[in-house]
Amino acid sequence: MKKTVIVILSLCASVVCAQDSLRFNPIVQWDANPVESQGQTGTCWSYSTASFLESELIRMGKGTHNLSEIFIARQVYLNKADNYVRRHGKTQFGEGSLGHDLLNAVDDYGIVPNEVFNGLQTTSETHNHAELASILEAYVKAVVSNKGKKLTPLWKAGYAALLDVYLGKYPTNFDYQGVKYTPQSFAKMLNLKADHYATLTSYTHQPVYTDFILGIPDNWANGTFYNVALNDLVKQAKTALKEGFTIAWDADVSNSGFNSKEGIALVPVKGEKANFELTAPEMEVTAALRQEHFDNYTVTDDHLMHIVGLVKGVDGKEYFVVKNSWGDERGLDLYKGHVLVSEAYFKMNTISVLLHKDALLKKLKNKLNLK
């Protein structure tokens, strides 16, 4: 993937933009498709991971493609319903999922370009799944209540019909750039496979350098996470970015330090307000403090995004350039639709990072016994 050179003067000449360029200097930023909006949906996991895969395709020399986030969401909704019913309703159901769910769905169902399946069935140009989500949840709860005392296989067809109506039918074949594909053959052509990727996290309630099932509500599929030391997690993320890789990022964004309007995320010292001018110190984040915030629900699994670069702030610190899925109207003029995330914020609020196994540090890869 070629590096995107950010030329400040060519992007904007406003005073605000000039101020932004004084506060932040680019270190590296990699190609990504334009910022999109997930609308009124809980599909950040699909938007972020699809964006990540789009950058992966550019990096791998496969060209620029706009992948369908809602095609994958539709298929994952099928998997979630099956899981919910098999567990007699004793598990998470809703719109939320994680990055590995998208990758697994690509393995199982394939993937399609957005122009083939955009999931919009009305005249609206934006997604709103509020009605659909309520109906799907009511449906699976009714199935689980099992008033007929014995389930028939018909419930799956009824559930799929709801998805057909609200999102569209599964496209069995399509033409794209002059070639005929099925969703599976398109994924094969793009060489997208779940086992090419790994998800890393860092918590002290599990042994370091082992894999485990992270206990968070959206891990309904019991996905595996690799546990590493906190400093290794930060080093791995920065090194991957500097070597040409991007990262799918799961994090907490519910705290006052995350400000999408300002386009900056910080961890203010306890009792202080976040200073988005970068003129105040941040809290020192340790592994113990991170664990405490996770254990007491201060930090939860809120939102998935896509890390595409690094910048250096006027305070001398490095910030992650994070592509969001809330549209391109928020944030700094130079980074519309993005949030610049401090290292302290990353340490405190990261749930996990998903990246290509080729991006893993050799020593870390050996410790995790990954091939």
Predicted regions and their residues:
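Alpha-helix boundary/interfacial micro-motifs
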Residues: V15, R59, H65, T126-H127, ...
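Bacterial Sec-dependent N-terminal signal peptides
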Residues: M1-S21
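Active-site signature of cysteine proteases
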Residues: A157-K371
